[in-house]
Amino acid sequence: MAENVLEAVSVNKYFYDPVKFRVLTNLSFSIEKGTFVSVVGKSGCGKSTLLYILSTMDTDYEGEIILDREYLHEKNSDELAAIRNAKIGFVFQFHYLIEEFNVLRNVMLPGIKLGKLSKQELEARAYEQLKMLGVSDQALKRPNQLSGGQKQRVSIARALINEPLIIMGDEPTGNLDKKNSDIVFGIFQDLCAEKKQTLLIVTHDLDFAKRSDRVIEMRDGQIMT
């Protein structure tokens, strides 16, 4: 029987300004370990709102989120930050690399925050991730010296540095051309197939979504598939 990495149970979300409005309606689903899941739907359907709840960055919701068999809703902000750093890797539309640091240091940052490895161990792991993603030759460069596709590969390496249970992405190919979008998709596919990495990716790219293992379609705050 497959192990569930992430579960949402009867999740509801409201916005209150200017009037009370339900954004997410009674969402329940689970994601099995080692699956590549895409979330699709029109703008405003609640995709990114759901992702922020699942990633523990939004705690103002009804229902329950279970990550690695831990119930998250009653945990405080410090506990959630620790869980987020240890168990979730993030890849966004924008890379959010720090220009003052070189590529290697950027990849190491979540590991430095976690504090489980020595600097030498962390450097070695960061370099291995960059090598796997084909950008190890850029390790000592600053982000502004990289192409858009290279920056996104570096951000994926950063997401992997703490060996997370799940990688969550919000439009990770949104700023990329077709060639680089395909490269990023291939990286995700390989991570899932070879390393049993669990992926949950919000995307507008239906071609990207169709090639993943599973598609969750959202409409007006509800799950259709």
Q: Language-model features: where?
A:
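ABC family nucleotide-binding domain
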Residues: N4-L6, V11-R211, V215
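Short, Lys/Arg-enriched, disordered terminal segments
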Residues: M1-N4, T225
